[in-house]
Amino acid sequence: MNIIQTLEAEQAAKLAEKRAIPDFQPGDTIIVNVKVVEGERSRVQAYEGVCIARSGGGLNESFTVRKISYGEGVERVFPVYAPLIDSIKVVRRGKVRRAKLYYLRDRRGKSARIAERQDRTADGKIKKGGKSAPAPTAAE
């Protein structure tokens, strides 16, 4: 690794320990909590949508989130390590076979849906995308 890559890796590690960045990829539905400053007041605004692309690398890495707001498609590009991002949460994992989902821009309704990915655990059981409910006990 050259000097610049080493410095970028150190900075990325330092920024990642302040705020946890979950492992997500295109097709995943995510909620990005963004700090919005209006005059002297500051608040956190949630932006929920489908991640349609991740680009760049290191400190310059960014991702694009697309959502439908009042019937109109809205896309927003966020740098992964931006200080204005309060938190990122993965709502559901999507099953896609592309790295860039720009084709979703031309689709509406059911054709724009993304199937949920089902991950398999080490013992072969199917675990739905990310979160798993606790197993029911005999007392319930």
Curated annotation (Swiss-Prot):
Query: Among the record's GO biological process terms, what is one?
Result: translation
Give the superkingdom in one word: Bacteria
Pfam families documented for this protein:
Ribosomal_L19
Q: Name one GO molecular function term.
A: structural constituent of ribosome
Function (record text): This protein is located at the 30S-50S ribosomal subunit interface and may play a role in the structure and function of the aminoacyl-tRNA binding site.
In terms of NCBIfam families, this protein maps to: rplS_bact (TIGR01024)
Protein name, entry field:
Large ribosomal subunit protein bL19
Annotated organism of origin: Xanthobacter autotrophicus (strain ATCC BAA-1158 / Py2)
